[in-house]
Swiss-Prot record:
TM region(s), chain numbering: none
Lineage top rank: taxon: Eukaryota
Subunit comment: Component of the 7-subunit TFIIH core complex composed of XPB/ERCC3, XPD/ERCC2, GTF2H1, GTF2H2, GTF2H3, GTF2H4 and GTF2H5, which is active in NER. The core complex associates with the 3-subunit CDK-activating kinase (CAK) module composed of CCNH/cyclin H, CDK7 and MNAT1 to form the 10-subunit holoenzyme (holo-TFIIH) active in transcription. Interacts with PUF60. Interacts with ATF7IP. Interacts with Epstein-Barr virus EBNA2.
Chain intervals with Low complexity compositional bias: 211-223
Region (Disordered): 1-47, 211-242
Listed PROSITE patterns: HELICASE_ATP_BIND_1, HELICASE_CTER
Annotated protein name in UniProt: General transcription and DNA repair factor IIH helicase/translocase subunit XPB
Domain Helicase C-terminal, chain residue ranges per copy: 541-701
Amino acid sequence: MGRKDKSDREKKSKKRYYEDEEEDEEVIGGESQEAVPAAAGKQVDESSTKLDEYGAKDYRLQMLLKNDHSSRPLWVAPDGHIFLEAFSPVYKYAQDFLVAISEPVCRPTHAHEYKLTAYSLYAAVSVGLQTSDIIEYLQKLSKTSVPDGIVQFIKLCTVSYGKVKLVLKHNRYFVESAFPDVIQRLLQDTVIRDCRLRSAEGEETELITETISSKSAISKSQQDNGGPSSSQPADGQRSGTQVPEDIFSYYEQMDKEEEEEEETQTVSFEIRQEMIEELQKRCIQLEYPLLAEYDFRNDTVNPDINMDLKPTAVLRPYQEKSLRKMFGNGRARSGVIVLPCGAGKSLVGVTAACTVRKRCLVLGNSSVSVEQWKAQFKMWSTIDDSQICRFTSDAKDKPIGCSVAISTYSMLGHTTKRSWEAERVMEWMKSQEWGLIILDEVHTIPAKMFRRVLTIVQAHCKLGLTATLVREDDKIVDLNFLIGPKLYEANWMELQNNGYIAKVQCAEVWCPMSPEFYREYVAIKTKKRILLYTMNPNKFRACQFLIRFHERRNDKIIVFADNVFALKEYAIRLNKPYIYGPTSQGERMQILQNFKHNPKINTIFISKVGDTSFDLPEANVLIQISSHGGSRRQEAQRLGRVLRAKKGMVAEEYNAYFYSLVSQDTQEMAYSTKRQRFLVDQGYSFKVITKLAGMEEEDLMFSTRDEQQQLLQKVLAASDLDAEEEVVMGEVGGKPQFSRRAGTMSSMSGADDALYMEYQMPRGSKASVGKNIHPLFKRFRK
């Protein structure tokens, strides 16, 4: 019994290895679980839903169809899923509202699917939506009556969220609320009473009642025209008469409320600074999580820095909208902004820093990312070069007089001994009071690393930027309480249709396995199988053909390979430059600069180090030859390398290409389907190519059986370590240097590189060989 259980466990762990992200090794500690309110685990109650005779869910009794249902754009299922008609004339009024209150599940061309979750409703309240607003507008937009279970779920999740705020004013912390009864309820708790600041005589300080005037720190531009974002603006205007009056007037009212200067009466009490963490934990336990807001305009303790946006920096409508969610009430809210790769996340970060105008810390996940952030600050803002300091293993600028510091997660989270110079910089970083911390590629960092980084540096406001808020584990939800709720998420197809990102043709190229390679693939059970389907000669030929085809069109091509053995083999045989983990920073920058500006260098090979933070706007073709199992995030990040809008291209035509080369009848095909899920949900479609036209006419490598046999021998001679994925040193979530792996007896005897080969001797050769043998040895042959 025990042996069977063990084998089952091993099978499961082997399966998970490929599906999980690189960072999944870290286990969330018990302490991180404390910071999640009980309401976050609640689900929509579906117990009242009946099934019809065919086993399908029957919603007819719970949801009554409205008379004017054809002019309403959506319906809400009792399980919390919301279905929106993208072709409806009312689409533009519903799109922004649904993004604010729910999580996008799938957004193809004609119908979009969203899901109400506790976290999405928490985010909605945090950006200013009230419980009554959410329910009322949902009822106005719905084709049917909204199920009672959904109304109860919305009330349950939003009744206490957003009611209490932790505000920093004049370097003093206050718990603030517009609801006096909530403040009184909190003060009845003994732990919170202990956190309250007392006067010199030991008496509690008085409650402060004041009227706050708030207005968005980001004003609307003329090009936005005050309307919601839409992929079909003309349709909405043309069909304006079909919009029901109640939907139109209610949207206008909500939009007006968001932009108008508001006066709110608040009640607050001051908190002892050393008790902040204790207070936050206790408020979460009482189901009143504190929203962190930074009143940066009234912060007189931290000096303003001399930094503004350049006149040439023009924000696009969706960038403005995301920033208005962050600065909606004149204060800076902490949270996450989700924009596609190439849609200008860096400009959003720089604009946020210029709006706050306090000391800013930027964290990326590689030294290349640090250099690019520095270039972005110099490009979009008026900041002086001397005010920017970098802190990486290669570049440690002196932090004296620095206003913007740029570093990596691994540099700040480093726990072992540092050099004297690095220790001094770290002490300086810890001593600073940062106004804003920008966390780039925020999805890649495990919870433990976050806690380490966020406890090392003190920041009033945290802004997370990412293109893919997905992970194969459930750790993505930790971002809600470690940083803040999701403030804004853009629609990829909408940005593509408006020309803000490239129009990409996605294709999956099926490469048949050669008979010799497939025979070995079926026989071998170790990780060397990965090498066999990656080094498949037909895949190599397809890659070579696509490179030649696109180079003739003067395209810029990036080839991605997670496996270093395959990366080197492909690049060296095709005589192309390649970048992987051990490549020095200087060599990387030289290769990337040549790729950008040298017309003779049109193709580069990159390992997984280029998945994120490599800014290559010139690239318009991406070929993927090997990948990290079934990781949806990696597929989307790689597509992002070619998503940047192309200059001088016609928007109606495809102007970027994404090829994923897959060996047929292997495990790679299953992984490929899993990887595409996120992009398919965003509205992309993958074209399957089984035969590349014109490939037979080309003179390609490995066209003969002998060449293929030699390649097979080289692959079989490789060790199991060559089949391992690349471990990127210094990268957050990198796997340890040792690992258990299945081996063979030949490995134990040191015969890993030895090959057994049979040769057929021609007939009569024995006799001819015998003639040349010395008579002395002939006696021993008898």
